């Protein structure tokens, strides 16, 4: 995360953060089926700083003036581990979660659960185009979704 935050200061781009855990089956499926899709890879690399964030890992970084770490991290522990303070601060409780941040590192919103490339496409393009600023209700999102024409291949 720190690398993406540092890069934003020189070249502002939004951040796309994949929040996962070691034991999460849908997280592994997302890696295998969605994040290896050529359309997803190309689009994310062109428009976002991509971050993989272990929600139970021991990364340390500074976000918006606050230092984040996982003081309860135990190296080598298998299965569920204590959550990273950053994951808790974002109120991430389900995995996988994909979290979007704007060019100034402000949280936009998270998307939870496994998504196919075609299901993820609408969120990537909604965020990248800044349309999310106008789509402010579930009803508006349904209308946006109905009119959305995707281009990602399976």
Task: Please describe what each predicted stretch is.
Residues 35:
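Serine-hydrolase catalytic core recognition
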Residues 28-32:
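Detector for the c-type heme attachment site
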Residues 25-26, 69:
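A short, structure-level motif marking secondary-structure boundaries and short turns
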Residues 19, 102, 112:
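Glycine-rich, histidine-containing beta strand-loop boundary motifs that form or position
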Residues 1-15, 44:
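A short beta-strand-turn-helix
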Residues 110-154:
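Thiol-/selenol-based redox modules, centered on thioredoxin-like
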Residues 2-3, 38-41, 45-109, 117, ...:
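Thioredoxin-like thiol-disulfide oxidoreductase module
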Residues 10-25, 50:
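Short active-site neighborhood of thiol/selenol oxidoreductases, capturing the structured segment around
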């Amino acid at each position: 995360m720190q690398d993406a935050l540092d890069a934003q200061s020189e070249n502002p781009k939004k951040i796309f953060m994949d929040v996962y855990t070691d034991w999460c089956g849908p997280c592994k499926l997302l890696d295998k089926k969605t994040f290896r899709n050529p359309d997803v890879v190309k689009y994310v690399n062109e428009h976002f700083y991509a971050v993989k964030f272990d929600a139970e890992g021991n990364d340390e970084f500074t976000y918006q003036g606050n230092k984040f770490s996982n003081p309860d991290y135990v190296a080598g522990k298998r299965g569920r581990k204590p959550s990273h303070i950053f994951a808790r601060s974002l109120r991430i409780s389900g995995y996988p979660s994909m979290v979007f941040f704007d060019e100034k590192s402000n949280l936009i919103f998270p998307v939870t659960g496994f998504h196919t490339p075609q299901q993820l496409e609408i969120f990537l393009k909604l965020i990248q185009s800044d349309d999310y600023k106008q789509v402010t209700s579930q009803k508006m999102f349904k209308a946006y979704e109905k009119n959305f024409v995707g281009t990602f291949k399976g």
